[in-house]
Amino acid sequence: MIFFIKEKQNFKKGFPVFLCFLFVLVVFLSSCNNSEQPTFTNRIASIVYKNCTPCHRSGEAGGYSFVTYEEISKHADLIAAVTKDGYMPPWPADTAYSRFCDEFVLTQSELQALQLWAESGAPLGDENNIPKSPEFFVDSIHEKPDLILKMTKSFFIKGDNADKFMIAKLPYEIAHDTFIRAIEFVPGNRKLLHHMNGHLVSYPEGKKKNVSDGEHLVEMNMDTDQILIYQRLGLQNDDGTFPALTPSVINYLPGVISTVYPEGIGGYRMSKKGAFLLKDLHYGPTPVSDSDQSVIKVYFGNKPPKRPTNELILGTLGVSEVLPPLQIPPDEVSSFSTEITTTEKISLLTVNPHLHLLGKSFKGYAIKPNGDTIPLVRINKWDFRWQYFYTYKKPVIIPKGSRICAEAVFDNTTSNPNNPFSPPRQVGERNTSMRTTDEMFQFIITFLPYRRGDENISLEH
Ligand code: HEC
């Protein structure tokens, strides 16, 4: 630009140079995709394949399948509309605060391209250069699973507008002891299944004849003794003692996509005989009867897990108190917080903010002993439907003696369209209830004790 202004003073002499500059500029602009008429081939396919197709293909949650040009162009106007108003792709975390793996986020220019494409009639473009649609494994996060276990019985969800809490046992028997690299949970009913916390039961050699003993689906009554439930499920060894239980090997919340760590991080030992225990299987209220038969997919590893991950829950049912106690008065917007202090230096892998329907916003951060703040996650507009386990691109290193803090704002007024009560009622934590209409405030973190070099590990795949 400076060059241009200078030349302007001596117009005659500068004119050919200016023409030359203009020519270069035109060539440059026309070779630059962004200003070109967006077509399916030159721009739209790659945007949709990255940000939409993972959930919009057969067997996935998104209803519409967006794989071929026909499927995508047919819905160009709808795609333009849902992206313009920010409804899709679903990514509640503020990317200006912290960044994660596998973000579903459109840049301003991608957003504009989708609008422009729809307005101009969704052209295909150069049909010889259509990008290949991405390869996905049906119903699967990555390659073919080594073991697929389905709930032995489908759960009939009665349409009585009441929350339901179940425990399912998925027994298995394999050829020999092995290692688990990753576990994937595929809900059979994504509309109604709100939560699941999966544990792994391992029977030592010779301790259990028939892993299928007992009931496979039991209602989880909050007041019933847990041991009684475990006995009904036939979890005990043949001598009546209980086998080892590895807690929280897999968790599900609305929209969660399973996390897969690089080899060497996470993973579990898996004995020849055992069972997955799907606890806290929580189905939201529905007026229409429905059913669920969820599936667990297991990916075996070759090596023993070197660095098992640790999980910590802050807040409701967790290790730190919610302050003030989580009681949300009607017709008010109120704020709560919870925090812990780290007793060792840690490498933080994932964070999962969890609230229910009254959630309005959420913020998680760490404060180092020297006073510096490490931003962890910020959700400016809470959305109950998308509660990812956000995975950092690289572990976030948090020094020993840091405070890990979470702040949640709840909107218990009539202006919250998700408020389950009209007029609003006092809502809060109730005993150990996890009903959708009661509230929870949790910040779940997964981490490793720090090791030198952790800051350079890539968690992307
Ligand atoms: C993480 C999964 C996920 C991603 C990524 C995603 N969607 Fe969706 N989408 C869904 C689900 C699930 C629904 C069903 C609606 C619901 O339950 O809220 C949906 C619904 C829709 C609908 C139907 C809206 C209606 O009114 O019926 C459209 C259109 C849509 N998505 C377009 C897109 C587009 C375009 C993208 C990419 C820019 C995208 N989605 C990315 C999961 C996803």
Predicted regions and their residues:
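Short acidic/polar inter-strand loop motif in beta-rich domains
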Residues: 121-125, 284-288, 409-418
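Bacterial Sec-dependent N-terminal signal peptides
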Residues: 1-39
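Extended, compositionally biased non-globular segments
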Residues: 341-344, 349-435
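Noncatalytic modules at the cell exterior or secretory-pathway interfaces
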Residues: 180-181, 268-283, 396-410
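Solvent-exposed, flexible loop/coil segments flanking beta-strands in beta-rich domains
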Residues: 131-201, 287-358, 417-461
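Beta-strand-rich globular domains of non-transmembrane regions
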Residues: 230-302
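Aromatic- and Gly/Pro-enriched helix-to-coil junctions and flexible linker segments
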Residues: 32-170, 274-280
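A surface-exposed loop-and-adjacent beta-strand signature within N-terminal beta-sandwich domains
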Residues: 73, 77-78, 86-101, 197-262
